[in-house]
Amino acid sequence: MAILYYDEKKLFQLNTENTTYVIGLSPEGYVGHVYYGPLLHGEPDLYPLRMDEPPFTPSVNKREKSSFLDRFPMEYPTGGVGDYRESCLNIRNAQGRMGCEIFFDSYEIFKGKRPLTGLPASFGTEDEVETLEITCKDPVLDLVVVLSYSVFTKENVITRSVRVKNEGSEALKVEKIYSACLDMDNEDFEILSLHGSWGRERHIQQGALRYGKQLVSSGKGESSHQEHPFVALVTPGTDQERGEVYAMHFVYSGNFIGQVERCQFDTVRMV
């Protein structure tokens, strides 16, 4: 199986032929990113989440919420709850308050990949792809957020998407929604993107990953030849034969933002 769940450890393991992606659940129900890299042989563990490490001072981590959330490696961060890095989902309620906090509710693993209604998307047979859907809920807003991960084993690709549903009686405004997030420790990464113009698309641009935010985007209603909807983190000296590359690429895009943020703890968030 490409996707495994370890109930005792509260871990999901997604395997392609050469890579492993691991998702873990904190005791509070936050969905966290544990690992993405070369294929793991055997069960993973939760310790990379570092949930009990002191966030700022050499004292016991008492789970003070704002300091905990501002360093926890989220799978899908939301705005207005204490994680001050870039969020993937911002919701405003009918009273004008902005905030959304989602917790794990349930999961489903199945063969194949469901289509994205109204959008072009990757596809595959039940023999080619396996999908994990993690359902999260905000109990205050009655909001459901479904995180979808489809594993194309032979291609070493994991595709991601998100669905949001308002199950309450109050109107909610979606101010921002991104497809995915990847939180990682910094490994002296450089940022790589593709720029161009008419007749000379897809030129490689690579440089230092600075503290703060760096992004590529298009507001033209299409992905554009000026900025391609692609961003990657690469280790120094990477070329087509060696090095580590962690990349995100839209299958299709109108307006888009691809952003990388290096934070105070020297971790990296890519959305």
Please identify what each model-predicted range represents.
Residues K10-Q13, E17, V31-V271:
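Polysaccharide-binding surfaces and accessory modules of carbohydrate-active proteins
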Residues M1-D7:
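Terminal leader/tail segments of proteins
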